[in-house]
C-alpha cells in the first residue's frame, strides 16, 4: 500500500487561511533548512521534495482551490508531471532510442543502446548504481574479445555474431591464468599442521613434539583407507570417532604410539577433529589424583582392550602417567592438632565417659570405657586418619570454620545436658555409642544416642527438694488436698474481691471487662502456676473472669490504665474465710477510660445499661449503643462553608492584572490609574439580619462590573435533608437569583430564611456572601462613575475619534484638538443608575500614549488598552449568558422569592 501523503499545510507549518506571503516565507525558510546541500540528514531529500510539492500546489490559486476542496485527489492527476517541463520529451526520446518499434522479426540478440535517463529534480530518474551493475554484468566477459570490432550502430544488420567469439574467449583467454591448486596443497597443509601442533601441545616432551612435527606429511590415501576399522592400527572411541595407534612417517613407515587405554583420556583435555594424534596427549596428575594414589583401595587397570565398546553412561576414570609427578608444595598432608582434638570421636566420647565414670566409681558399676571393644577403637582410629586426610585438602578459612563448628558442638554436648538425680542403683545406665557420619570432610554425631535407653523418655517431675530455692514454696493443705501459695493467693484474691465490689456498678463492670492487663499481668509474673482459691459463700461468689478479646478495645478506643509491663503491688492480708467479709485495699491504680472513650449518648436514645452476666453481653450492649448513636442526626455547631467561585476565573484575573501592570509601566503610570483609589476594607452589617439559625454559608467572588450594572447573580448550591422518621439523608439542588447593587464595593451579604440544611428539626437559614473583585478601569465615586481612555498624541493635538468606555460597552467620541494629558471629560446621563429613571454622570480621564502611530496604522498601545478594557466587558456578558441559559431551560414558571429575602440584602455605605 502506498504511503499516505502529508497535508501540504502541515508540511509548510501553515494554517488554511494563510495568504501568499505566508506561503512564500514558509517555503524559503524550510527550503534553506532542508536543502540537501546544507542538511546531511538521511531524510532531508525526502522532506525537501515534500516542501517543493506543497509550495507548487499552494502557490497556484487553481491547484490550491482544488486541494482545499478535494484534497490530494484534486491535484494528483495534474500535479504528478508538473514539476518537470520536458518529461514527455525525454519519455518519447527513450522509446526512440530503445528501438522497441523497429523490425520485430530480427534476432533479439541485438544490443540495445543503454542511455541513462536524466535525473531531474527529486521526483524522476533512475539509479546510476543499478545501471552500472547491469552494464557490468552484460559486458564483463566479452570486453577482451570485442576490441577489434567496430562500434555498434543503431541498425540490426550491423550487429556481428559474437557467440563463436565468446566460446573462444572462454577456452583460451583464461586458460593460462588458472593456477594448479593441487600442487600447493602439500606444503600449505604441512605448514598449517606444524603451526597448529605447536600451539595445541606446548608442554609435551621435546622428543615427542619433534616426532609429531616430522610426521605431518600425508601418506597415500590408499594406505589410510585400508587400515580404517582394523583394530591393530586404531579403535573407535565412545563418540564413534576413529583414533589411530600410530602414524606414517615421511618414508611411509608405520610408527607406533605409546600404548595407553583410549578411555583413560581425561575429559578436560582439548582435542581437534583435523588432527589424528589426540590419543597421544599426555595426562597430568592433579592434586586429587595424588590423594587418590595414596588412599586408593582399588588398582587402576591400564591394559588396552582390543576393541572398545561405547558406554551408555561414561564415568570419569582417574589415570596415571608413566612419569611420577611431584605434589604441589602448598599441599601439606599432615593432621593439625586442632582438628584432632575436635574431630576425634574417641576423645569426644571420652568427655562423656568422664562424667559417667565419676558416678560409676561411686556405685561400683561398670563404666562405658569398659564396654568399648578393641575393634571399635580400631575403627575410630581409621576414621580419624580419614578425617585428617580429608581436612588436609581444605583451605585455611574452611579449616578454621570447621574447628569453630565442631567446638560449638562439643560445648553443647558437655553443658546442655542437665544433671540427673535418678537413683542409679534402681536401673543400670546403658549408654549407647554415638553414631557418626562423614560428609565432605566433616564429622557429624547423632546426639540422640547419649540418652539413657532404659529410662522413660518423659521423666517424672522432680520433688520439691530439687526445685529452685528462689521460687516460693507452696504449702499443701492436708485436709482439702489443695496446694496454695501465700503471695500469689493474696494477689489473686485481692483482684477478685475488687471486681466483686465493683460488679454492682454497670459502668464499672463494662470497664472491668475492657481491661486486658488485669488478667495478663499476673500471668507474666515469674511464679509457678497455682490453682486460684474459691469463696464458698454464695452471696460473695464471683463468676470466673472470661478471656479478653481484642475486638472491643479496638472498636471503642479504650486504653487500659495499667500497662502490660507494670507489676501489681501485693499486700499481705489474711486469707478469706467463708463467713468473713473482706474490704479490699486499693492495690491497683483505678480503672478509668481515657479521653478517647465513647461520647455519652443522649438520655432518651440509649436505654439504661443492664447488669451484664457475660463479657459477650457487655460487648453487645456497647455495640447497640454505638449503633443508636450513629443513627442520630449530627447537628454541627459551625455552619458549613460552600465556595462557589470558579477557580479558572481567579487564574484569568491574575493574568489580566499582570498585563495591565506592564501597560501602565509603559505609560509611566503606577500599577493602577491615578483616579483608582483603594477603598477601605470595612463591613457594615444590617442589624435586622438574624444569623442565629444560619447553618449554611455560600461564598463567591464576582467582578465589580456586574455590581455597577446591577445585574442578577445566579446562585447554585446543594443542601442536605434528613428524614426524622428513617434518619435517611438526601440532597436537594437549589438555584437562586440575587439582585446586585452598584453601592457594594467590598462584599454583599444576604440571608435567605429556610434555604439552609434540614437536619430533621426544621430548615436552617442560608447566608450568601458575594465578594467584589475590584475593577482596573472603573471606579464609582461620590460624583459618579470614573473611567479612562488612551489617546494618541497626534489625535489629542489635532483632534479626531477616540474610544470611550461606559459601564455597559464602549463608544466613539469626536474630540477637538488641544487635549492635554490627564484631561477630564464629563458625559451626562451615561454613568450608573442613581434612581430607576435617572443615571449619573460618566467621567473619562484622557492619557497620552508613550508612542505615536505610524502613518495610517492604529497606535499599538491604544489598541492594547482597548483590548484590556474589553476583558471586563466579556465577564459582564458571560454573566448575562448564564442567566439567559438558565431562563431558557425553565419549563415551568419560576418560583420567586419573597420580598423579605430581598430586603435582607446588606449593602455598604460610603
UniProtKB/Swiss-Prot annotation:
Residues 111-121 have a biased composition (Basic residues). One of its GO terms (cellular component) is cytoplasm. Residues 102-160, 260-408, 451-486 are annotated as: Disordered. The keyword Translocase does not apply. InterPro entries: DnaJ-like_chaperone, DnaJ_C, DnaJ_domain, DnaJ_domain_CS, EAGR_box, EAGR_sf, J_dom_sf, Termin_org_TopJ. One of its GO terms (biological process) is protein refolding. Residues 451-462 have a biased composition (Polar residues). NCBIfam families: EAGR_box, termin_org_DnaJ, terminal_TopJ. It comes from Mycoplasma pneumoniae (strain ATCC 29342 / M129 / Subtype 1) (Mycoplasmoides pneumoniae). Residues 357-379 have a biased composition (Acidic residues). One of its GO terms (molecular function) is unfolded protein binding. This is DnaJ-like protein MG200 homolog. Residues 4-73 form the J domain. PROSITE patterns: DNAJ_1, DNAJ_2. Keywords: Chaperone. Pfam families: DnaJ, DnaJ_C, EAGR_box. The keyword Chloroplast does not apply. Residues 273-283 have a biased composition (Low complexity).
Amino acid at each position: 500500500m502506498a504511503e499516505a501523503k502529508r497535508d501540504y499545510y502541515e508540511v509548510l507549518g501553515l494554517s488554511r487561511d494563510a495568504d501568499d506571503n505566508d506561503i512564500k516565507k514558509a517555503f524559503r525558510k524550510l527550503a534553506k533548512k532542508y536543502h540537501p546541500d546544507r542538511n546531511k540528514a538521511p531524510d532531508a531529500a525526502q522532506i525537501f521534495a515534500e516542501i517543493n510539492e506543497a509550495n507548487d500546489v499552494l502557490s497556484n490559486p487553481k491547484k490550491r482551490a482544488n486541494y482545499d476542496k478535494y484534497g490530494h485527489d484534486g491535484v494528483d492527476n495534474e500535479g504528478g508531471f508538473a514539476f518537470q517541463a520536458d518529461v514527455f520529451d525525454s519519455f518519447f526520446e527513450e522509446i526512440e532510442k530503445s528501438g522497441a518499434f523497429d523490425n520485430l522479426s530480427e534476432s533479439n540478440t541485438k544490443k540495445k543502446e543503454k542511455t541513462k535517463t536524466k535525473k531531474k529534480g527529486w521526483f524522476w530518474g533512475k539509479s546510476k548504481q543499478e545501471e552500472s551493475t547491469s552494464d557490468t554484468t552484460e559486458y564483463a566477459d566479452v570486453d577482451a574479445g570485442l576490441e577489434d570490432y567496430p562500434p555498434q550502430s543503431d541498425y540490426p544488420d550491423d550487429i556481428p555474431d559474437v557467440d563463436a567469439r565468446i566460446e573462444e574467449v572462454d577456452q583460451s583467454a583464461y586458460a593460462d591464468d588458472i593456477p594448479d591448486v593441487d600442487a600447493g596443497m602439500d606444503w600449505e597443509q604441512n605448514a598449517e599442521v606444524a603451526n597448529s601442533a605447536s600451539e595445541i601441545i606446548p608442554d609435551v616432551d621435546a622428543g615427542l613434539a619433534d616426532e609429531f612435527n616430522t610426521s605431518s606429511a600425508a601418506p597415500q590415501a590408499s594406505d589410510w583407507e585400508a587400515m580404517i576399522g582394523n583394530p591393530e592400527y586404531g579403535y573407535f572411541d565412545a563418540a564413534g570417532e576413529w583414533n589411530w595407534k600410530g602414524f606414517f612417517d615421511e618414508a611411509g613407515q608405520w610408527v607406533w604410539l605409546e600404548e595407553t587405554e583410549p578411555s583413560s583420556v581425561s575429559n578436560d583435555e582439548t582435542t581437534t577433529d583435523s588432527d589424528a594424534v589426540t590419543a597421544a596427549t599426555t595426562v597430568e596428575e592433579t592434586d586429587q589424583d595424588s590423594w587418590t594414589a595414596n588412599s586408593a583401595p582399588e588398582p587402576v587397570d591400564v591394559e588396552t582392550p582390543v576393541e572398545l565398546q561405547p558406554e551408555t553412561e561414561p564415568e570419569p576414570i582417574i589415570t596415571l602417567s608413566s612419569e611420577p609427578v611431584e605434589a604441589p608444595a602448598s599441599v601439606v598432608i599432615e593432621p593439625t592438632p586442632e582438628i584432632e582434638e575436635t574431630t576425634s570421636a574417641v576423645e569426644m566420647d571420652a568427655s562423656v565417659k568422664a562424667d559417667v565414670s565419676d558416678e560409676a566409681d561411686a556405685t561400683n558399676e561398670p563404666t562405658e570405657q569398659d564396654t568399648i571393644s578393641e575393634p571399635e577403637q580400631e575403627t575410630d582410629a581409621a576414621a580419624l586418619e580419614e578425617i585428617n586426610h580429608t581436612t588436609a585438602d581444605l583451605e585455611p578459612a574452611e579449616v578454621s570454620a570447621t574447628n569453630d563448628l565442631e567446638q560449638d558442638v562439643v560445648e553443647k554436648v558437655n553443658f546442655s545436658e542437665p544433671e540427673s538425680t535418678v537413683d542409679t542403683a534402681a536401673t543400670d545406665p546403658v549408654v549407647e555409642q554415638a553414631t557418626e557420619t562423614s560428609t565432605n570432610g566433616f564429622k557429624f554425631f547423632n546426639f540422640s544416642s547419649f540418652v539413657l535407653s532404659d529410662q522413660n523418655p518423659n521423666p517424672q517431675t522432680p520433688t520439691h527438694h530439687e526445685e529452685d530455692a528462689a521460687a516460693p514454696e507452696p504449702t499443701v493443705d492436708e485436709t482439702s488436698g489443695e496446694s496454695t501459695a501465700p503471695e500469689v493467693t493474696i494477689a489473686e484474691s485481692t483482684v477478685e474481691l475488687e471486681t466483686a465490689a465493683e460488679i454492682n456498678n454497670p459502668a464499672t463492670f463494662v470497664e472491668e471487662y475492657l481491661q486486658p492487663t488485669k488478667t495478663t499481668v499476673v500471668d507474666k509474673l515469674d511464679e509457678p502456676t497455682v490453682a486460684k482459691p474459691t469463696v464458698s459463700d454464695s452471696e460473695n461468689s464471683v463468676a470466673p473472669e472470661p478471656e479478653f478479646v481484642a475486638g472491643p478495645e479496638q472498636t471503642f478506643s479504650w486504653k487500659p490504665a495499667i500497662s502490660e509491663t507494670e507489676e501489681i503491688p501485693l499486700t499481705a492480708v489474711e486469707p478469706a474465710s467463708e463467713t468473713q467479709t473482706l474490704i479490699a485495699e486499693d492495690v491497683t491504680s483505678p480503672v478509668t477510660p481515657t479521653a478517647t472513650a465513647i461520647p455519652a449518648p443522649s438520655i432518651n436514645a440509649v436505654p439504661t445499661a443492664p447488669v451484664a452476666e457475660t463479657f459477650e453481653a457487655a460487648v453487645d450492649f456497647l455495640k447497640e449503643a454505638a449503633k443508636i448513636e450513629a443513627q442520630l442526626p449530627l447537628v454541627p455547631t459551625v455552619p458549613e462553608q460552600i465556595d462557589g467561585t470558579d477557580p479558572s476565573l481567579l487564574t484569568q484575573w491574575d493574568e489580566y492584572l499582570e498585563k495591565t501592570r506592564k501597560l501602565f509601566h509603559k505609560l509611566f503610570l503606577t500599577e493602577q490609574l491615578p483616579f483608582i483609589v483603594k477603598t477601605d476594607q470595612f463591613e457594615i452589617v444590617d442589624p435586622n439580619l438574624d444569623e442565629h439559625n444560619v447553618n449554611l454559608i455560600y461564598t463567591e467572588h464576582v467582578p465589580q462590573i456586574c455590581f455597577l450594572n446591577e445585574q442578577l447573580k445566579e446562585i447554585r448550591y446543594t443542601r442536605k435533608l434528613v428524614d426524622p422518621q428513617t434518619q435517611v439523608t438526601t440532597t436537594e439542588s437549589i438555584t437562586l437569583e440575587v439582585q446586585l447593587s452598584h453601592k457594594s464595593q467590598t462584599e454583599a451579604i444576604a440571608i435567605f430564611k429556610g434555604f439552609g440544611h434540614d437536619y430533621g428539626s426544621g430548615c436552617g437559614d442560608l447566608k450568601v456572601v458575594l465578594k467584589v473583585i475590584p475593577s482596573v478601569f472603573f471606579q464609582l465615586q461620590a460624583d459618579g462613575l470614573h473611567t479612562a481612555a488612551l489617546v494618541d498624541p497626534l489625535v489629542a493635538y489635532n483632534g479626531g475619534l477616540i474610544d470611550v468606555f461606559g459601564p455597559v460597552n464602549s463608544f466613539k467620541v469626536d474630540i477637538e484638538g488641544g487635549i492635554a494629558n490627564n484631561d477630564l471629560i464629563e458625559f451626562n446621563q451615561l454613568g450608573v443608575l442613581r434612581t430607576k429613571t435617572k443615571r449619573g454622570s460618566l467621567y473619562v480621564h484622557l492619557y497620552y500614549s508613550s508612542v505615536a502611530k505610524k502613518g495610517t496604522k492604529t497606535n499599538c498601545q491604544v489598541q492594547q488598552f482597548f483590548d484590556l478594557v474589553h476583558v471586563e466587558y466579556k465577564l459582564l456578558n458571560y454573566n448575562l449568558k448564564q442567566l439567559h441559559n438558565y431562563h431558557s431551560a425553565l419549563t415551568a414558571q419560576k418560583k420567586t422569592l419573597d420580598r423579605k429575602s430581598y430586603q435582607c440584602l446588606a449593602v455598604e455605605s460610603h
